[in-house]
């Protein structure tokens, strides 16, 4: 089993300066806060609570989803997913259909209104991301993207150690 090595552990060999650690923590916190503020703005702009917004975004990758599949992807219990689904059904953004292979299973799919809302959200997000990239000098974009990829891989590796 993997585990996270404490900075005080005898197994800890690679040094990270206190300055680097503090700077990293502050930058991650600021990025997280910025993302949370953007998420709140998006939810208000598109008239959806956070959980319904995140659930709707899952349909960008899939044509059909089940409540169980949504629960796994969102990392929430099935009863919570039921409330999220009910909200999206009430707003007529998704609809239920019976699985042709197993009538006990309900498949969830976007309605035309749901497709339109998702397209609007994706267009908005593309515009935001485009504007962010425009703030970075063209000759620095590749390095920024490479470093973000390294950061993502590092964070995923540490996450695996926590499991």
Language-model-detected regions and their locations in the chain:
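N-terminal leader segment of winged-helix/HTH proteins
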Residues: 1-46, 93
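Charged, amphipathic alpha-helical coiled-coil/dimerization segments
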Residues: 2-7, 87-149
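Hydrophobic alpha-helical core bundles mediating ligand binding, dimerization, or RNAP-core interactions
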Residues: 21-43, 118-136, 141-155, 159
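N-terminal helix-turn-helix DNA-binding core of bacterial DNA-binding proteins
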Residues: 33, 37-80
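Amphipathic alpha-helical interaction surfaces
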Residues: 34, 65, 87, 91, ...
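Short acidic DE-rich linear segments
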Residues: 161-163
């Amino acid at each position: 089993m993997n585990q996270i090595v404490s900075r005080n552990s005898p197994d800890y060999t690679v040094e990270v300066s206190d300055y680097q650690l503090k700077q990293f923590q502050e930058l991650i916190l600021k990025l997280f806060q910025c993302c949370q503020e953007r998420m709140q703005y998006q939810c208000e702009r598109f008239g959806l609570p956070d959980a319904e917004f995140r659930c709707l975004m899952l349909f960008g990758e899939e044509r059909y989803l089940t409540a169980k599949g949504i629960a796994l992807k969102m990392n929430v219990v099935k009863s919570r997913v039921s409330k999220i689904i009910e909200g999206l059904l009430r707003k007529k953004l998704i609809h239920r259909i019976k699985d042709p292979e197993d009538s006990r299973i309900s498949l969830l799919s976007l309605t035309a209104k749901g497709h339109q809302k998702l397209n609007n959200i994706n267009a908005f997000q593309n515009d935001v991301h485009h504007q962010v990239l425009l703030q970075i000098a063209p000759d620095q974009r590749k390095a920024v993207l490479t470093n973000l990829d390294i950061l993502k891989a590092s964070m995923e590796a540490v996450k695996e150690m926590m499991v």
